[in-house]
Amino acid sequence: MTQIAIQPAIRRRHQPWYKILYVQVLIAIVLGVLIGYFYPDFGKELKPLGDGFIALIKMMIAPVIFCTVVHGISSMGDLKRVGRVGLKSLIYFESVSTVALAVGLLVGEVLQPGHGFNIDPATIDPKSVATYVTKAKEEGIVAHLMAIIPDSYVGAIARGDLLQVLLISILSGFAIAFLGKAGEPIADAIDKAAKMFFGIIRIIVRVAPVGAFGAMAFTVGAYGLGSLLNLAALIGTFYLTSILFVLIVLGAIARLAGFSILRFIAYIKDELLIVLGTSSSETVLPQMIQKMEHLGASRSVVGLVIPTGYSFNLDGTNIYMTLATLFLAQATNTHLTIWQELGILGIAMITSKGASGVTGAGFITLAATLSIVPDIPIQSIAILVGIDKFMSECRALTNLIGNGVACVVISISEGELDRDALHETMAHPLEIGEALEPGGGA
């Protein structure tokens, strides 16, 4: 089937600063922090604003993923090419994810953020994490894998389970590709539906500043900035590790691929600020698909790599899992041998898959990992409850950057990247990023 052309060249434009999306979101985040700090009770009442925005985006995630993956596979035509792109993606995801897990372990061993806490697990009240522990114990590795299979085709989309939607999308894409010319009308109809869904997303994203304001006001109002000071060592270590991972590991990968990681970050600044405000990378999945296409990446590759990366390429979550696990071991004076640490890394390689970009998913995944590791008391995750919300932003930001880099790298490896579009974008990342805002008329 014919490859649908990449979107037309970007028309750069200038507009008043107060109309620029990232400026609006940044102001909203600052106002949210101030409201939450000075008027915590009022800040907590603003939670529906953040929840409402996330819910609006989440209602579009399943149909957007379905359309992009199905069209991405069916438009490739050559099923060997589909398999090649899929295999390259999985190898890349697993390699970089393993590096992220190892980096978390290494930094945790070197900096020892949990040293000196001397917490007795018997004194920890497990009630605050009972829900997470129960959910983690119910979802063993086999149950986790079996949960990928939905009860029904429509049910997967209705529930919005990312892995289930991916499964039916991949199967549908292959089925349409097998139909040959007879499948082209179906692929075209799905492409038209995708355009409609992206149009809805553009409308929803206009209220992103309101969502970011409400989410940040609630976070600061409910948990307080004081909780940050109590566990500043862990928070600081995690943020530092994530920044170094992005600049050094992802930076090296980007340099080898022929672009600057800093310019790439500038290009997706709007999406990063929305993620910062909402703590969920899922809120910008549709925008990332469009931005990667405008960057010059092939539409079919983007349609495969970005959605699957949201389940299988979670660099920030991986760093958090091994670093937080070591922190809890150190804080409870639980000695781990090198073999036990390697065992944690191996278990985390499995449990981290499918921890989608939903806010709080990293904490549930950590509980699932600890439920399989008998050495560290699982109730010790109660120590992290008060600060997890502040760490979820960093997880989501790192996940988002990692997925964008993966998409560019795999497009290059397939010879499916428009180098001229990439170089133009990297030369003017701020201006071009601004031109792609909702209503920007790219």
Swiss-Prot record:
HAMAP family to which the protein is assigned, alphabetical: C4_dicarb_transport
A molecular function (GO) term: succinate transmembrane transporter activity
Key word Transport present: yes
PROSITE patterns for this protein: NA_DICARBOXYL_SYMP_1, NA_DICARBOXYL_SYMP_2
Gene source species: Bradyrhizobium diazoefficiens (strain JCM 10833 / BCRC 13528 / IAM 13628 / NBRC 14792 / USDA 110)
Subcellular location: Cell inner membrane
Protein name (database record): C4-dicarboxylate transport protein 4
Segment forming the signal sequence: none
Keyword Membrane: yes
Membrane topology: Multi-pass membrane protein
InterPro entries: C4_dicarb_transport, Na-dicarboxylate_symporter, Na-dicarboxylate_symporter_CS, Na:dicarbo_symporter_sf
Family: Belongs to the dicarboxylate/amino acid:cation symporter (DAACS) (TC 2.A.23) family.
Cellular component annotations (GO), alphabetically ordered: plasma membrane
Function: Responsible for the transport of dicarboxylates such as succinate, fumarate, and malate from the periplasm across the membrane.
Keywords on record: Cell inner membrane, Cell membrane, Membrane, Symport, Transmembrane, Transmembrane helix, Transport
Transmembrane segments: 20-40, 53-73, 90-110, 160-180, 209-229, 233-253
NCBIfam families, sorted: PRK01663.1
GO biological process: L-aspartate transmembrane transport
